[in-house]
Amino acid sequence: MDVNSEPVKKVLSKYKFRDVAVEELQKVYRVYPDMKIMAGTYTSSDSLQKDLLKLVGNIPVVYQGRSYNIPILLWLLDSFPFTPPICYLRPTSSMVIREGKHVDSKGRIHLPALHNWDHPKSSVNALLAEMIGKFEEEPPLGTKSSAHGDTPSNLLDYVSNLTITEGGNRPDQEVKVSVIGGGDLGIAAVLSIMAKSCVDKLVLIDIPENSTKGGTMDLEIFSLPKVEVSKDLSASAGSKVLVITANAWSDEQSYLSVVQTNVDMYRGIIPRLAQLSPNAVLVIASQPVDVMTHVAWRQSHLLPTQVIGVGCNLDSQRLSHIINISLVANNTGKQAWVIGELSENKVAVWGNMGPGTDQLQALTPVSNSTKPLMDRAFEMIKGRGQRSWSVGLSIADITHSIVTNQKKVHSVTTLAEGWGGIGSKVFLSLPCILGETGSTRLPGVALGSEDEMKLRESVACQVNLFMQLRL
């Protein structure tokens, strides 16, 4: 493998572990002598460009007794081999990518070896061996339909009629939901969603957290219909909803360092989840939910309507229930909502309901005549806390509205920029209509001075925190 060409030497000189990288490349050459090392410009998903090395070549795949060559490309980051390659298929103009469990619609390859990369235990040769094994189970390429009678060759002539049943959100696909996080909240979310009977398949992905848990193992022992337990993020491919319950908490850390730990954990899972299920709605339940929903949106590069947090949905449902029991709201055409940050700064407002419907038409601030009632009800819900099982029920409520396209209103964490004069990119709980494509935020409302101050304080705190976080 020629690493002495001027373009390669120029780029390689900027690599942090040059000698180790060259040694790893030589190992690849001994097993795959046709692989070529080249210099190129890599463009990331956020349009940033960087000069990197890339491995280009074919890997041999045997499918049903026949051997085929699969063209691939591996981008090597400047911290290679201590960071995994970014792997893509290299289809020609006559090829079509077969989106599946290990390949997304853009041809990016997702494998356990990449997710669990740990050099020197991990190597490119081992990665390629796993890639070959996965592609032998599920061929990743086919041919495009040709009006000119072109003769397909190699793998394409054999797999052009194969139907890949996994990956992507197609109209005829089963309703699949994935819960990422194996702690008590993850288990509660799984059981609550299953009780709603609104999904065909539910995947619980158990990722490492700084907590003691045994529920995931119990689910594996006492298996439930429609529930799959996995440790591989790729099992979530093709999900309609991705629920993130994972937390990396520690009582020994400062608040900033605890949040940063969660941000770092998200960096390892959110981008890949978004790539595996690009049409999914992300429902964030990690804490602090307002901050982590913002982080998930930034890291996933999804539309803001596709990323929501559980936010004040539970508090809103509790508040409404308490007020309805008092028989005050039954004849007023109003419903109580909790909005803002999930903290002491959350705010209660009224929602005007459409005549004879459950559709929210507009929000109104609490008037002097209804303030005593609202204050008493608000104090009652503050003491109830947010235990795993209750948050799990709230997650199921939100998930049900999304997968059944109910167009129901929930107070969920969403991008608040532009709502009620908020000028910063922050996430707060606001009433949103939820459906299969995500959330639609309802118009803002003029709040009283005290409530307005609470919202502004929440915005300022979030802005200040994000200035200190490493995303």
UniProtKB/Swiss-Prot annotation:
Keywords noted in UniProt: NAD, Ubl conjugation pathway
Domain UEV per the UniProt entry, residue ranges: 2-145
GO cellular component, one term: ESCRT I complex
Pfam families noted in UniProt: Ldh_1_C, Ldh_1_N, UEV
Alphabetized GO MF terms: oxidoreductase activity, acting on the CH-OH group of donors, NAD or NADP as acceptor; ubiquitin binding
Binding site for NAD(+): 183-211
Top-level taxon: Eukaryota
Record-stated family: In the N-terminal section; belongs to the ubiquitin-conjugating enzyme family. UEV subfamily.
Purpose: Possible negative regulator of polyubiquitination.
Protein's UniProt name: Ubiquitin-conjugating enzyme E2 variant 3
Organism: Danio rerio
